[in-house]
Amino acid sequence: MFQIGEALMGQGAELAHVDLMIGDKGGPVGQAFANGLTQLSVGHTPLLSVIRPNLPPKPSTLIIPKVTVKNMEQAGKIFGPAQAAVAKAVADSVEEGVISKDQVEEIVIVASVFIHPDAQDYNKIYRYNYGATKLAIKRALGGFPDINTVLEESNKSTHAIMGFKVTRLWDPPYLQVAFDNPDIEFVQSAISQIPKSDHVIIEAGTPLIKRYGMDVISRIREVRPDAFIVADLKTLDTGNLEARMVADAAGDAIVVSALAPISTIDKLIEEAHKTGIYAVMDTLNQQDPISVLKQLKVMPDVIELHRGIDIEATEHAWGNIAEIKKIAPKILVAVAGGVRLDKVPVALGQGADILVVGRAITNSKDVREVAEQFINSLNKPEIDQFRVMTDF
């Protein structure tokens, strides 16, 4: 047996976070247990869990402090409420049948325990660590989470300590608000008026980037830290270099022109995927985007069917969305140029995943009101809007 469990519980400085391994005495967990007892580390000295002095639980459990213990006051929080909490959680797990009595002499547990140096309330330290340990044991022996849960939740979750959400594009359709006005104060003001939504993307347009460079991404994050930000570079050369520049600036996606050499597009997509950002291929003035897709080694994450500002009076060019998705079923299709409220049903009906809207929102007299109208037209609820959530 070799099972892994994790749980976080509580709040404030007394918050408990427990990582643990459960396994056979003769296996890797048993070896880790023995090593922990015999190879001590300054500030992270392992200790046996005990319900009270002279009463350890079964299976035997080794506690390892995650945070360096620097003085006896901090040591008392481990050698006390945390030590007892972990032990009682193990004993209760046996009593409740989570751990079989037949296994208690065959397996051991190694638990890493987080105690913040500022934690003061021993009652909370005990209760939070008891709950976290018990939950971690149950999860470990129950195989939680399964891979389907991981994949479903990975794009929804915000790490409690990190404090902000990294947005990914997994639940279309989306509204992408494009800012071409090269005035950062105007852009920041307009972004602050756009309603917060799981289905809004912010685009740093080409003129904006030409004026301010990659630093404009940080300026946008000052207003909307968790925004999904597209850097519309319309790359034509040095694709890998420009993709790395966007990634280093904490952008989420880079736009490459479909007019670029195939080798440039390939290098940009490869570098984007290497650095964890999205690659968007813009078809502005490219008469045959399908042929470009067929020549690529790796598909972009998004293809943008784009009608330029200077030619927006002509009919839209969204008719080949179905053909694109036959070639690349997982690709997201964005439509840009001439997207008005009355055109939203048409675009969505033809299979568009992202609606790119610029001046219709950014130059309107009431940015918030118009943006809300576009968001509502997507007919898409917020992710987990009706979910009452503790941990799951």
Curated annotation (Swiss-Prot):
Pfam families: Fae, OMPdecase. The keyword Acyltransferase does not apply. Pathway: Carbohydrate biosynthesis; D-ribose 5-phosphate biosynthesis. Coiled coil: none annotated. Residues 162-392 are annotated as: 3-hexulose-6-phosphate synthase. Residues 1-161 are annotated as: Formaldehyde-activating enzyme. SMART domains: OMPdecase. Catalyzes the condensation of formaldehyde with tetrahydromethanopterin (H(4)MPT) to 5,10-methylenetetrahydromethanopterin. NCBIfam families: one_C_fae, PRK13307.1. This is Bifunctional enzyme Fae/Hps. It comes from Methanosarcina barkeri (strain Fusaro / DSM 804). The gene is faeB-hpsB.
